[in-house]
């Protein structure tokens, strides 16, 4: 009986994929690579130019951006590096 209960618990965890998170890069511009675990199902990379040169922002999700900002969204671990 205990074996059956344990089997059901394991099957439930595997089937529900509890706790899955996507790992996205979150370093800014040319900073050393850093990552964060995200509950969102996508990562983003925003690129734009200003008086300091080309700027890059990375993070979780897929935000809306203003005109003139290049946005790349993706759905695999560290895909926004």
UniProtKB/Swiss-Prot annotation:
Entries under SUPFAM superfamilies matching the protein: Snake toxin-like (SSF57302)
Gene3D superfamilies: CD59
Entry's localization field: Secreted
One Pfam short name: Toxin_cobra-type
InterPro entries: Snake_3FTx, Snake_toxin-like_sf, Snake_toxin_con_site, Toxin_cobra-type
Keyword field contains GTP-binding: no
Signal sequence extent: 1-21
Domain of life: Eukaryota
Distribution of this protein across tissues and organs: Expressed by the venom gland.
Keywords recorded for this protein, A-Z: Acetylcholine receptor inhibiting toxin, Disulfide bond, Ion channel impairing toxin, Neurotoxin, Postsynaptic neurotoxin, Secreted, Signal, Toxin
Keyword Secreted among record annotations: yes
Coiled-coil portions: none
GO molecular function, a single term: acetylcholine receptor inhibitor activity
Cysteines joined through disulfide linkages: 24-43, 38-60, 62-73, 74-79
GO cellular component, as recorded: extracellular region
UniProt family annotation: Belongs to the three-finger toxin family. Short-chain subfamily. Type I alpha-neurotoxin sub-subfamily.
Function: Binds to muscle nicotinic acetylcholine receptor (nAChR) and inhibit acetylcholine from binding to the receptor, thereby impairing neuromuscular transmission.
Name used for this protein in its record: Short neurotoxin D
Provenance organism: Aipysurus laevis
